[in-house]
Amino acid sequence: MPSDDTEFEAVVTAYYEPLYRFALGLSRSEADAADLTQRAFERFGEKAGTLRDQSKAKTWLFTTLYRDFLQQKRHDTRFPHAELDETFDDKIVEMPRAEISADANAAVTALHAMGEPFRSTLLLFYMNDHSYKEIAEILGVPIGTVMSRLARGKEMLRTKMTDAVNDADKEARV
């Protein structure tokens, strides 16, 4: 545990929102995002005293959350769960679309359709304002890989968005 409760509360207050947004972007599930965020803070509470440099708490939290996400994803791949009742699909709550512009909605949809390494890199850079160096530490890859994933991810996103606009134009003409 950090040296006192106020330090821990300060870290939670400072990083809960961006950490949760990152988890939500990765998992696409509010429940999973909340679990991942809580687990990251639990581990921080247990191991913060072992951090040599307390200024690295932010990077440590994002790295821990990302690794937990990957571990959960591997587990879910090996042990897929089956739905007990298909009527639960009707009860899934979606984000209120009226509050999100059509462009933002299309961008989020395109982002979620991207492959994992590109999605997480774009989320960390644009949604959480991490530097290349911080992203490299969080994802455990070289800075050059981060730069490459950002460039390729932006191009993929641009292509998906252009295709979506073209499809919408075709539908509007019909």
Predicted regions located by residue number:
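Structural recognition of an alpha-helix C-terminal capping motif at a helix-to-coil junction
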Residues: 21, 35-42, 55-67
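Sigma70-family region 2
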Residues: 2, 38-56, 75-76
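Short, aromatic/basic-enriched loop-to-helix "N-cap" motif that marks the start
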Residues: 17, 47-64, 143
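Internal acidic/polar
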Residues: 71, 79-108, 131, 170-174
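A short pre-motif secondary-structure segment
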Residues: 121-125
